Amino acid sequence: MSQLQVRHDWKREEIEALFALPMNDLLFKAHSIHREVYDPNEVQISRLLSIKTGACPEDCKYCPQSARYDTGLEKERLLAMETVLTEARSAKAAGASRFCMGAAWRNPKEKDMPYLKQMVQEVKALGMETCMTLGMLSEDQANDLASAGLDYYNHNLDTSPEYYGDVITTRTYQNRLDTLTNVRASGMKVCSGGIVGMGEKATDRAGLLQQLANLPQHPDSVPINMLVKVAGTPFEKLDDLDPLEFVRTIAVARILMPLSRVRLSAGRENMSDELQAMCFFAGANSIFYGCKLLTTPNPEESDDMGLFRRLGLRPEQGAAAKLEEESAVLAKAAAYQDKSSAQFYDAGAL
């Protein structure tokens, strides 16, 4: 009998009851639902590139890109088009089907919108899906990016409404929900999830998933991040989250949002192969591939390739053979060359 339910009226106590299930029961329920919708041995692969790094005015306590914290991160200007395209070609050659571009902004400036739209069009011309995360979007900005062909827009809710004020004060929870509304209204697909391990309680993890699952339409992609503690940020000395609580979060996300891609996102660098295998069984079916997520370490491509082989997993769209090849096209986003080179885009030159 099918356990799949697509609902938008989940109550907090229902979700907390799922979290409280014995692990075997929870995993069985989540995996059964997962198999009803998806091939359980296929994983969607995305590559994430920081197109503008650091100097963000926001005060997210987990983020090394905030200008408010001394994390040793050097700010970078918006990347030049050819640099972005070289990275996109490398991602495609390595088996990624989606290329995600992130900028450390509160929101994009109007002067940069034509360039961002061109970036979307150029990457799409390579035959890849496109995603951006640029901060808050107005209705007009969302429509502009949609008109350029942007497939996905990422804007995370981060945590529950109740715990949110302990994480960030420079934008409201409603600001985030408004951006998701603008993205969905534009026709783009929504990518939205959160971060666990930020000192929140179990009820906050339930609250985050409740907010996502009770949106008028579930996010198409739900990234679940494990906090990566960065020296210099207010959250650098928080206690580690029990890894099994992370697995539970993945499983409950799969149950609540059965048609969504659930992405095993930041924090994989610190996860054992066994923990990742449990997450895939619990319903995770998307990852970021490559050694860095914006400014955060990620497993090497060869490590992911080996894990996929051992687990019998394969990338979506049959790019398995290309995972054999080492990506030798360009140094990764952290190894940017001289800031004065043509690697960076100059908005003033438009």
From Swiss-Prot:
Pathway: Cofactor biosynthesis; biotin biosynthesis; biotin from 7,8-diaminononanoate: step 2/2. Residues 41-268 form the Radical SAM core domain. Its cofactor is [4Fe-4S] cluster; [2Fe-2S] cluster. [4Fe-4S] cluster binds at residues 56, 60, 63. GO terms for biological process: biotin biosynthetic process. It is an enzyme of class 2 (transferase). Binds 1 [4Fe-4S] cluster. The cluster is coordinated with 3 cysteines and an exchangeable S-adenosyl-L-methionine. Its EC number is 2.8.1.6. Keywords: 2Fe-2S, 4Fe-4S, Biotin biosynthesis, Iron, Iron-sulfur, Metal-binding, S-adenosyl-L-methionine, Transferase. GO terms for molecular function: 2 iron, 2 sulfur cluster binding; 4 iron, 4 sulfur cluster binding; biotin synthase activity; iron ion binding. [2Fe-2S] cluster binds at residues 100, 131, 191, 263. It catalyses: (4R,5S)-dethiobiotin + (sulfur carrier)-SH + 2 reduced [2Fe-2S]-[ferredoxin] + 2 S-adenosyl-L-methionine = (sulfur carrier)-H + biotin + 2 5'-deoxyadenosine + 2 L-methionine + 2 oxidized [2Fe-2S]-[ferredoxin]. It holds the Pfam family BATS. Gene3D superfamilies: Aldolase class I. InterPro entries: Aldolase_TIM, BATS_dom, Biotin_synth/BioAB, Biotin_synthase, Elp3/MiaA/NifB-like_rSAM, rSAM. Homodimer. Belongs to the radical SAM superfamily. Biotin synthase family. Catalyzes the conversion of dethiobiotin (DTB) to biotin by the insertion of a sulfur atom into dethiobiotin via a radical-based mechanism. This is Biotin synthase. It comes from Shewanella baltica (strain OS155 / ATCC BAA-1091). The gene is bioB.
